[in-house]
Structures are given as structure tokens and as C-alpha cells.
Regions:
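Active-site proximal loop and beta-alpha junction motif in alpha/beta enzyme cores
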Residues: 1-150, 160-177
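Helical hairpin unit composed of two closely spaced alpha helices linked by a short loop
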Residues: 154-156
């Protein structure tokens, strides 16, 4: 959880457990994460996390599909065909780019159908994304086991990777989500 690791970093700093260091590493289930803490007047203001490389191999995500990656692949949910790009940031994500406004989605109905789809043996987090005219991305997230969530660090990372893979964004440029 990208936001969770930032909260842990703040807790550690605020409770004197970093010895004043502003670069710390934390061992997680998805590997060692490095946090760069921004401190002002002795208080931590923000944390930047190196989330690591995205995983695109279907077996490692996991998604039950063949090939080297899953980019704009069809998936049928509720008799509707969506196109998904699958990415793992240490947890599985299914990113759906769509023209329909994500605000109009009945996420409490459709989210669980993606989460429990047979293609995802460990269930999946799903990001529904609009590419806006200015190139920014508007998304809603269905988090496996939690439901709709208002902030998802790994989901934002997965969406950024998927946007690059689908030609909606460029590598090494800022992406506004």
C-alpha cells in the first residue's frame, strides 16, 4: 500500500524512530521501499516513495492469461466487454480506460465483479480511468477486500504505467492523476 508506507514513515519520524534521518528504508512484503522524507521546522511534511518496478508478466501479477503482458486485453464482465491492462506494484491491478465518465459508474455493483473475476486467482484491485482533454487521468478505485477507496498509491502507480503502455502518457514525464 503506497499510502500506507508513507503513513508508516511519518509515524516512525514523528516518534523519533529514524534518528533524524530523512531517507529511510522499510522492508515490506513486496520488497524494500525507500522513503525520502520532507521535513520543515522539525515536522515531517511529506514522503516520497520509490515503489519499485512495475511487474507486467501475467503469472507474476497474477492474472490467468498467456503472453508476456496484458495490455488492452478484453475482459467480459456483466456481458460487457472492457479492455484491461494488468500491472502489479506488489499487488495486482486491472486498469480499465473508458470513455464513459467514471463518476457515473455503479462501482459498488461492478467493482466486486472485477475483484472476484475468475481470471484473477488472488482477486484484483481495479482502476476505472478517464483520460481528460488536458492529458490528466481521473480514476476511481475498487480495492480488493476494501471496496471503493478514495486514495490508492499503488493504484495511481499502476494507472501511470498502464497509461504509458496504452499511449495515453509518456515515460519520464509527470502524470497528473
Amino acid at each position: 500500500c503506497g499510502n500506507g508506507i508513507r503513513c508508516v514513515g511519518k509515524y516512525l519520524y514523528d516518534n523519533g524512530m529514524t534518528d533524524g534521518r530523512t531517507t529511510i528504508t522499510i522492508d515490506t512484503l513486496s520488497g524494500v521501499k525507500t522513503l525520502e522524507l520532507t521535513v520543515k521546522d522539525g515536522k515531517m511534511q511529506s514522503a516520497r516513495v520509490d515503489m519499485g518496478a512495475a511487474i507486467l508478466a501475467p503469472r507474476e501479477i497474477p492474472v490467468d492469461m498467456d503472453g508476456e503482458n496484458v495490455i488492452s486485453a478484453p475482459i467480459v464482465v456483466d456481458e460487457k466487454v472492457y479492455h484491461m491492462t494488468c500491472v502489479s506494484m506488489g499487488n495486482p491491478h486491472c486498469v480499465i480506460f473508458q470513455k464513459e465518465d467514471v463518476d457515473d459508474l455503479d462501482l459498488t455493483r461492478i467493482g466486486p465483479k472485477f475483484e472476484h473475476h475468475p481470471l484473477f486467482p488472488e482477486r484484483v484491485n481495479t482502476e476505472f480511468v478517464n483520460v481528460l482533454p488536458d492529458g490528466s487521468l481521473k480514476m476511481r478505485v475498487w480495492e480488493r477486500g476494501s471496496g471503493e477507496t478514495w486514495a490508492c498509491g499503488t493504484g495511481s502507480c499502476a494507472t501511470g504505467v498502464a497509461a504509458c503502455l496504452n499511449g495515453f502518457a509518456n515515460k519520464n514525464e509527470d502524470i497528473v492523476v
